[in-house]
Amino acid sequence: MFVLDPAAICCCAVTCCCGVGSVCAYRKRQSIPHPSECALIGKMYRLCGCHDHDKFDVLIEIHEIHDLTQSGKFFVEVHAGRSEERTGVCSAKKGRVEIQERVNIHVRQADKTLTVRVKKQGLTSTEAIGDAVIGVKSELIDGAFPKRQSFFCQKDGKTACKIVLSFHRLDTGNVSLGDFQMSPLLHQALLIAQSEAEARGETLQVDILNMTEVERLRFLSKVLEGPLKQMSSIGGAWKNLYFRAAERRNGKWEWQYWSSKDDCMSGIKKRGAYSFMAISLVLPDKHDRHCFYIRYHDTGGVHDLFFKRVDRDRNLWSDGLFEFIEKLREYLEKHPEVAMSGRGGHSSRREKKKEGDVGGSRTPRKRDGKALTPRTGASDDAGDDGIRGRSPRGSDRRALSHRSFVDPAELAEKRRVLSPRETAADEMTRPRASVLKGRMIEGLMYDRSLQPGEKNEEASEADERPRERTEGVEYEREEEQPLLFTQ
């Protein structure tokens, strides 16, 4: 006869709890810390030869997937011990998926392999396409962290596809940061400096702490150089451009662009530029992982600019632009005289032609039989009206040239209005890039070159519309009156 006494009940409860706990622990066994994660125990493991490498962080750049036999939407998962990261979902085109995303993975000293898994996104579930198992010591460390190397993804002993990966490990042994925090912009700038040092056969040696603020800006500006696609305002086609951040004069920074990298390196005149101080919003597209949006101000008003990444992660561009503009504003707010020296002390080519600099004299030439000298009151007033009329804002340029009229509080307020951080925070609803694209084009956006027939049709439509300022005219206006703020 079976009797339910308290001892039997406790024994059954303990048995059930142990069984459930064992099942949960087995399923979550990858999340259980390894003893070597303790610094002292890990050092003993290394001295005994149980582990062949130390712990480190590696940045994995996932470029693309090749040789897919299925269509649909795919994403990539990266596993290393207890660390797991995944990319966004991208669609396949002709057996190829272009991802161009970066994930940061922590590799423990107990981890011997790193697994890259390609999955297909279904309606309610996911399907594993194939895995690529990469040896940490044999393929990563001994292979000097390969760049753009193809790895075979296998499933059931058969090759399912190929994935192209790049591995970046930042050596911070000779990097002095001081109180500066590691940010995405600084991390990418250090990676670029490290690749340049490796190309010269040297080790990375950077002293961020002892750099001046201008030197720090120049060091960070390397991140904003590279190819991009910019959406054309006619038809929504994408045009290939090469961008680079450059300092034209003390405190005057521009995002200049050329038709190609060869034009930039060969010294050909730039096609145009965007002033960093005239960018009020940098917004990644939440619905398109490859695009981002910029709100730009010039003398003609507010412009919506759309860009698409080419050879790197979109977030490198959007986060890099955002952080660089903020650091540039902080520098100019600390040194307001630097910003005004580039603005007030700058004279346009048209004004230089109208000045008579003979023997060091700056007396203007005669116009309509009257000398524009300060001694003649009427002529001086007329000259002031002419200068004020030629200015896009109707302000006196000679008054702007005097630094004694600069109000630091007003200067900071103007910069605050145009700050991307403040603009994004003040907006009740952050604009969706898909809605903003609709302001520029009607219908579907296409990513291809225009055919000759379409170019003729668009040219005829452009002639029927009111004539707009061309890119060259726009840039000449900006050259004459450097735009740092928009009221």
From Swiss-Prot:
Top-rank lineage group of the source organism: Eukaryota
A family per Pfam: PH_CERLI1
Keywords: Cytoplasmic vesicle, Membrane
Entry's Gene Ontology cellular component terms: cytoplasmic vesicle; rhoptry membrane
Protein topology in the membrane: Peripheral membrane protein
Comp. bias intervals (Basic and acidic residues): 385-399, 454-475
Protein localization: Cytoplasmic vesicle, Secretory vesicle, Rhoptry membrane
Positions of the UniProt region annotated as Disordered: 337-487
Protein name (Swiss-Prot/TrEMBL): Rhoptry apical surface protein 1
Species name: Toxoplasma gondii (strain ATCC 50853 / GT1)
